[in-house]
Amino acid sequence: RLRIASRLSAQRPADMPPLNILIEVNIDGEETKSGVAPSEVEAFADEIAGYPGLKLRGLMAIPAPAADSESRRRPLAAMRALFERLRVKHPGMDTLSMGMSADMDEAVSEGATMVRVGRAVFGPRDYSAKCAV
Protein backbone atom coordinates (compact mmCIF):
# COMPACT_ATOMS: atom_id res chain seq x y z
CA ARG A 1 0.00 0.00 0.00
CA LEU A 2 2.79 2.43 0.77
CA ARG A 3 4.32 1.63 -2.60
CA ILE A 4 1.09 2.74 -4.28
CA ALA A 5 0.98 5.90 -2.18
CA SER A 6 4.60 6.65 -3.03
CA ARG A 7 3.90 6.28 -6.75
CA LEU A 8 0.77 8.44 -6.56
CA SER A 9 2.74 11.15 -4.79
CA ALA A 10 5.73 10.96 -7.12
CA GLN A 11 3.56 11.09 -10.24
CA ARG A 12 1.44 14.01 -9.07
CA PRO A 13 2.32 16.95 -11.35
CA ALA A 14 4.15 19.72 -9.49
CA ASP A 15 1.77 22.36 -10.85
CA MET A 16 -1.23 20.62 -9.27
CA PRO A 17 -2.28 20.63 -5.62
CA PRO A 18 -1.71 17.42 -3.65
CA LEU A 19 -4.09 14.56 -4.36
CA ASN A 20 -6.77 14.25 -1.66
CA ILE A 21 -6.86 10.73 -0.24
CA LEU A 22 -8.67 8.67 2.37
CA ILE A 23 -7.20 5.63 4.06
CA GLU A 24 -9.45 2.59 3.72
CA VAL A 25 -9.77 0.81 7.06
CA ASN A 26 -10.79 -2.84 7.25
CA ILE A 27 -12.71 -2.15 10.45
CA ASP A 28 -14.17 -5.64 10.84
CA GLY A 29 -11.11 -7.60 9.71
CA GLU A 30 -13.01 -9.17 6.82
CA GLU A 31 -10.85 -11.27 4.52
CA THR A 32 -12.99 -10.28 1.53
CA LYS A 33 -12.24 -6.58 1.98
CA SER A 34 -9.14 -4.50 1.45
CA GLY A 35 -7.88 -1.82 3.75
CA VAL A 36 -5.48 -1.20 6.57
CA ALA A 37 -6.04 -2.99 9.87
CA PRO A 38 -7.14 -0.58 12.62
CA SER A 39 -3.98 -1.35 14.61
CA GLU A 40 -1.82 -0.24 11.65
CA VAL A 41 -3.67 2.92 10.64
CA GLU A 42 -1.73 5.38 12.79
CA ALA A 43 1.67 4.32 11.43
CA PHE A 44 0.26 4.24 7.89
CA ALA A 45 -1.19 7.75 8.28
CA ASP A 46 2.16 9.04 9.56
CA GLU A 47 3.86 7.67 6.44
CA ILE A 48 1.21 9.07 4.09
CA ALA A 49 1.48 12.51 5.70
CA GLY A 50 5.12 12.64 4.59
CA TYR A 51 4.34 12.33 0.88
CA PRO A 52 4.32 15.81 -0.71
CA GLY A 53 1.99 14.84 -3.56
CA LEU A 54 -0.73 13.54 -1.23
CA LYS A 55 -3.06 15.22 1.23
CA LEU A 56 -4.51 12.94 3.88
CA ARG A 57 -8.14 13.98 4.23
CA GLY A 58 -9.45 11.16 6.41
CA LEU A 59 -10.64 7.59 6.70
CA MET A 60 -13.19 5.42 4.95
CA ALA A 61 -14.68 2.03 5.73
CA ILE A 62 -17.42 -0.35 4.68
CA PRO A 63 -18.44 -2.31 7.79
CA ALA A 64 -19.72 -5.86 7.54
CA PRO A 65 -23.49 -6.10 7.02
CA ALA A 66 -25.44 -6.41 10.26
CA ALA A 67 -29.10 -7.09 10.97
CA ASP A 68 -29.70 -4.77 13.92
CA SER A 69 -28.87 -1.15 14.68
CA GLU A 70 -26.58 -1.89 17.63
CA SER A 71 -24.50 -4.33 15.58
CA ARG A 72 -24.26 -1.78 12.75
CA ARG A 73 -23.27 0.97 15.18
CA ARG A 74 -20.35 -0.88 16.85
CA PRO A 75 -17.83 -0.70 13.96
CA LEU A 76 -18.98 2.81 13.07
CA ALA A 77 -18.24 3.97 16.62
CA ALA A 78 -14.82 2.31 16.40
CA MET A 79 -14.15 4.23 13.18
CA ARG A 80 -15.18 7.51 14.79
CA ALA A 81 -12.85 6.87 17.73
CA LEU A 82 -9.96 6.04 15.39
CA PHE A 83 -10.68 9.14 13.31
CA GLU A 84 -10.75 11.41 16.38
CA ARG A 85 -7.52 9.90 17.71
CA LEU A 86 -5.74 10.48 14.37
CA ARG A 87 -7.01 14.05 14.07
CA VAL A 88 -4.91 15.01 17.09
CA LYS A 89 -1.75 14.29 15.10
CA HIS A 90 -3.21 15.08 11.66
CA PRO A 91 -5.54 18.08 12.18
CA GLY A 92 -6.11 18.47 8.43
CA MET A 93 -8.21 15.32 8.42
CA ASP A 94 -11.82 16.35 7.86
CA THR A 95 -13.50 13.38 6.16
CA LEU A 96 -14.95 10.25 7.72
CA SER A 97 -16.56 8.24 4.94
CA MET A 98 -18.65 5.36 6.19
CA GLY A 99 -22.17 4.15 5.75
CA MET A 100 -24.31 3.18 2.83
CA SER A 101 -28.06 3.06 2.28
CA ALA A 102 -28.67 0.32 4.87
CA ASP A 103 -26.71 1.94 7.71
CA MET A 104 -26.60 5.63 6.85
CA ASP A 105 -28.61 6.70 9.92
CA GLU A 106 -26.18 5.00 12.28
CA ALA A 107 -23.19 6.26 10.28
CA VAL A 108 -24.32 9.88 10.40
CA SER A 109 -25.06 9.64 14.13
CA GLU A 110 -21.52 8.27 14.62
CA GLY A 111 -19.95 11.22 12.82
CA ALA A 112 -19.78 10.29 9.13
CA THR A 113 -19.14 13.30 6.93
CA MET A 114 -19.63 11.32 3.72
CA VAL A 115 -22.03 8.44 3.01
CA ARG A 116 -22.63 6.39 -0.14
CA VAL A 117 -26.36 6.11 -0.63
CA GLY A 118 -26.77 4.75 -4.16
CA ARG A 119 -29.59 2.30 -3.45
CA ALA A 120 -31.51 4.88 -1.40
CA VAL A 121 -31.39 7.28 -4.36
CA PHE A 122 -31.41 5.00 -7.42
CA GLY A 123 -33.07 1.84 -6.10
CA PRO A 124 -31.62 -1.67 -6.10
CA ARG A 125 -29.21 -2.70 -8.83
CA ASP A 126 -30.44 -4.95 -11.60
CA TYR A 127 -27.80 -7.60 -12.25
CA SER A 128 -29.82 -9.41 -14.90
CA ALA A 129 -28.39 -10.04 -18.34
CA LYS A 130 -30.81 -7.57 -19.93
CA CYS A 131 -28.91 -4.74 -18.26
CA ALA A 132 -25.53 -5.78 -19.66
CA VAL A 133 -23.81 -3.10 -21.72
Please report, for each region that a protein language model flagged, where it lies by residue:
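C-terminal helical cap(s) of enzyme catalytic domains, especially alpha/beta-barrels
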Residues: D105-V133
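Conserved alpha/beta-domain cores
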Residues: R1-A102, V108-E110, F122-P124
